[in-house]
UniProtKB/Swiss-Prot annotation:
Belongs to the GreA/GreB family. This is Transcription elongation factor GreA. It comes from the Bacteria. Residues 1-26 form a coiled coil. It comes from Nitrosococcus oceani (strain ATCC 19707 / BCRC 17464 / JCM 30415 / NCIMB 11848 / C-107). GO terms for molecular function: DNA binding; RNA polymerase binding. PANTHER family: TRANSCRIPTION ELONGATION FACTOR GREA. Keywords: Coiled coil, DNA-binding, Transcription, Transcription regulation. GO terms for biological process: DNA-templated transcription elongation; regulation of DNA-templated transcription elongation. InterPro entries: GreA/GreB_C_sf (IPR036953), TF_GreA/GreB_CS (IPR018151), Tscrpt_elong_fac_GreA (IPR006359), Tscrpt_elong_fac_GreA/B (IPR028624), Tscrpt_elong_fac_GreA/B_C (IPR001437), Tscrpt_elong_fac_GreA/B_fam (IPR023459), Tscrpt_elong_fac_GreA/B_N (IPR022691), Tscrpt_elong_fac_GreA/B_N_sf (IPR036805). Pfam families: GreA_GreB, GreA_GreB_N.
Length: 158
């Protein structure tokens, strides 16, 4: 199985979610099942069936998180060699050459990607175009509206 890149911060978030599911959510679901079971006939007990369904979702998510963490290659961004190149985990400030619009993205693994937080997947077209480039370099990104040209304004290793 291939290792999936994950920043230290992303791995910590997954660990926290896993801990929450195991120590808080799972016991609540077990209690809900026990309470619903106490109501009697299980065939027509909607509370029981809902609690069992929730238990299935929780257990599935726990398995997913454990699998993701077991197959993660955790990369501490602060320990990366700061040689001025764009690599996994860095934050890149870009300037659209045509519009002078600025954007900032952190390159993260697929599990952490969230455009609302300006985190883009290492497998995204823009990240693939950025990897290995240096500050001041220009890149071309194929977008639905056509090719967009960006200049790398800054690279941050935080």
């Amino acid at each position: 199985m291939n290792k999936v890149p994950l920043t230290e911060k992303g791995a910590q978030q997954l660990r926290e979610e896993l801990q929450e599911l195991k120590t808080v959510v799972r016991p609540k679901v077990v209690t809900a099942i026990a309470e619903a079971r106490a109501h009697g006939d299980l065939k027509e007990n909607a509370e029981y069936h809902a609690a069992r369904e929730e238990q299935g979702f929780v257990e599935g998510r726990i398995r997913d998180l454990e699998h993701q963490l077991a197959h993660a290659q955790i990369i501490d961004v602060s320990k990366l060699q700061k040689d001025g190149r764009v690599v996994f985990g860095v934050t890149v400030d870009l300037v659209n050459i045509e519009t002078d619009e600025e954007a900032s993205y952190q390159i993260v693994g697929d599990l952490e990607a969230n455009i609302k937080e300006n985190k883009i997947s290492i497998n995204s077209p823009i990240a693939r175009a950025l990897i290995g480039k240096r500050e001041g370099d220009e890149i071309q990104v194929q977008a639905p509206s056509g090719i967009i040209l960006y200049e790398i304004a800054a690279i941050g290793y935080q």
